[in-house]
Amino acid sequence: MKKKYIFFFVISFSLVRLSAQLPVGTFREHLPYDNFKSVAVAPDAVYAAGETSILRFNKQDKSLSTWSKIDGLSDVGISKLYYLNEKNTLIIAYQNANLDFVKENQLLNMPDIKNKQIIGSKTINNFFVYDNYLYLSCGFGVVVLNTDNFLVKETWFTRTANKNYEVKEMTASRNKFFIATDDGLFFTPTNNPNIADFSTWEPLIEAGNGNYTALKYFNGNLIAQKYDSSVGTDSLFVYNHNDWRYIDEISYEELRAIDVRGAEMLICEKYRLKVHDTQFQLIYTVNSWYNRYYENGQDAKFDGTDDIWIGDRVNGLVKINRRFNKKEFYFLDGPHSYLAHQIDSRNGNLAVVPGSNVNYQKSYTQGNFSYLYNKKWGICLFSAYDNLFAVQLSDLCCVAINPKNSQEVFAGSWGQGLVQYNTDAPPTLYNPENSLLQYSTVHEGLVFVGDITFDNNGRLWMTNSFCANPICMRQADNRWFSFSLNPYLVGSNVVDKILVDSRNYKWVTAPQLNKLVVFSENGTPSNPSDDKIRNVDLNTLANVKTSTITCLAEDLDGEIWIGTNQGVKVIYNPQNALSETVFAKNIIIEVNSGAQNLLEFENITAITVDAANRKWIGTSKAGAFLISANGTEELLHLNEKNSPLFSNQINDIIIDNTNGEIFFATDKGIISYRGTASEAKEDYNDVMVFPNPVRENYQGTISVSGLMYHSFCKIVDAAGNLVWQGFAEGGQLNWNGKDFYGKKPATGVYYVFSSDETGKQRNVAKILFIK
């Protein structure tokens, strides 16, 4: 393998970013910092890794800082942390075999294994140091690195003609290397001249076959952990180079990690911690560090002091002091889960649910949601309310913040109905027993809510699959109404998305039938006789005959944008939808001097309209696109290679139009981006310039927000000389901070003169430049 170097700085900072304004064109993450899978202990710090980010605890001042892809990490999907004490280096391994080496805030990325074409899994399972070399236990074998420069010395492939062995962990004892694999233990002399030839390795006959997941050297013995998938249990064995035996002195449940230091061995279980001496006698135990129901220990490490560190999936980074039996918990504010299926934003608040209704089957994702309210995350674990609901909630797949009351959030469950959550009251579960939601006629006892949304009057609309009346509406006074979509949807159909447009029309998708139905109760929900309903023709006038509708959006011109499994379609005359058949059409764009339908080769997952009527479009594999108002021009394409975006799988997009921040929900977490358009105002009472003052080292965009729609702006100096001019995008002007000649203005005060489209309303704002 040929070594490549990429150096850059990793920036550490505390998570106070939610209260800080985000400059245009920059990102910030919204990740869980209480959900950790791997821990590494350094002399001055402790590191805890989640799926996408790392929390750093400073031992001296007890401060917390974070690293993610935004701050310089090269990848996402962290699998393992390891601190190489001999080189004062933190090693970060990713699930795709990418590697980062961090020393004194300088990062070296080594993508060699990631980029190599290799048979078998590339996952790096563990690390082992021996004689100035670092050995990586991988899915395909062992990679040997020189710890002086992290160059690859050699690679040992652990495969025979008929089988590939995954190496889970490696150690050395009595001048022999031992490896634990998914099918037994193997060994070879450390000076074996043909060590890269797996046929020269010998199986440890006494260990037999089986999946060995851990291997440690302890007090002259080998300690091996074996997992039996047939019963889902682990066993520990000891080998003293003569005898192989089961360690019956140690009892354990759900064994998660083993650590060895000196004459002590640490055992970490899901909710219990134990320390044993060289005779395997128990010398210290913690039966619970918080509450067994809410504990999920994943990794644990000795500190060399009286402290033990635990990475917990629920409680963050846990420190246990053995001398005083004291427990401390370290975490930062954030959502509960990396999974983000749907999000909603209102007035600077953000709600997210992790469940889904993919393929319209239950996945039994844990029922919870997270809510960023007044710049603080709140988490609702519905298992805490089981005594109220008498049901274990799962698959919360849709969420909506009440536009009339930001303290109130609703979430729909694919199987259990609708949850009403208030920040200062217990939640309420709605099902057929206390609402007009209906049980499925196909799946006994289940209530399938696929999507929810509020109309302009504060009424909540939702889809209800597999029943006679697939649309329900709840008023603020808790009066319920349900609606039939006959004759277009009859019987037990899946109804998924619902959009309430500016005309109060309801657009409803039936994905398995490839139907889009438009419906109006005509303002009289209790009188079905005046209801109107029609079917939309999706394919007759379209260039691409699609089979599945995935999402809906209304733009500022009232046009209906439709996301499908093969690109985007638009209904240009939706005002006629209830009086005549309307047709969906593709958008034709120019590509390499030819014509092509907009994103016709992409599965569209989300469409959101910004304050300038541009469209943010999410896809399942290609990231996110910013498209011009009419859809004919690609303005920006964000993906995991050209941006900090965590994943190319975009599940949802929502915009906080008060500041132009765009939130992307992905399968690996939420990330936001400050766009160039924000909500237009009706006057100039709330104009704000950011940043202000503009410091000498600032190179980013200067934004003037709070403007009236499409304001014309002129920037002049104190003498009245024109420096630059332009139009606002929605209610926001974006300026690169340079004059017409590309030069940064001199130190001084500059004035932004703004006027609306009529020229009747005007405003003046000031900017201070420091050069």
Enumerate the language-model features and the residues they cover:
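Glycine-centered coil/turn sites that cap beta-strands in beta-rich domains
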Residues: V10, S14-L15, E682-K714, Q732-W735
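Conserved beta-propeller blade signature
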Residues: A45-A48, T89-I92, Y133-L136, K176-I179, ...
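Short glycine/acidic-enriched loop and turn motifs that connect beta-strands
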Residues: S53-L55, A97-L99, G141-V143, G184-F186, ...
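Short, surface-exposed loop/turn motifs with a glycine/proline- and acidic-biased composition
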Residues: K69, A728-K760
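Short, glycine-anchored, charge-dense loop/turn motifs used at functional sites
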Residues: F712-V723, Y750
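Blade-level signature of beta-propeller repeat domains, shared across WD40, Kelch, NHL, RCC1
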Residues: Q649-A680
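Short coil-to-beta transitions that initiate beta-strands within beta-rich domains
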Residues: L22-A42, S68-E86, P111-Y130, E154-S173, ...
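Short loop/turn segments immediately following beta-strands, especially the blade-tip
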Residues: Q106-L107, D148-F150, P189-I195, F280, ...
